[in-house]
């Protein structure tokens, strides 16, 4: 990984700047975001998850909902401000930790029954090389328990941000398939936020028994 310290500092500075302004994505107040979260939780229905790892938890907006199907959660975010605010929720069986996933020891803390990448992967692709993201995907697969799952949700339509273009989001999706995850469920969530029609691709990948 090239210049890990410089990249980490860039990432932390970027997200700190956003979270210090409040709720930059309106995760707590947007009807669109709340409906998308509910759709993500519903796609996980039908089983419980013993240990869950949430990557890029922010202020814990989605973490709160994960406490329903999950027995214990480790929620990571690179922003100290976000983690401090997440702690204020006082969620049971949740550990919020300031951590860059690219520096996290997945080998030491595995296995995970559920891994969550909620609107996170394209930021990693912006900050790091595709090789680095591919290596992370491989490590996540290895750290997933047999029959465990990975939930990935990404905005992929309706906005002009080049990070969110459907072909780019599909490339990340295919990356996780190529490291041996199997697509268990997938759907497109559609809604309107601030007058803009937006689509989000919600995917559940599974690590099937060998």
Where are these regions (language model features)?
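Class I (Rossmann-like) S-adenosyl-L-methionine-dependent methyltransferase catalytic domain
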Residues: 1-108, 127-141, 148-210
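A short acidic, Gly/Pro-enriched loop at the edge of an enzyme's catalytic core
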Residues: 107-115
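A short SAM/SAH-binding and catalytic strip from SAM-dependent methyltransferases
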Residues: 114-130
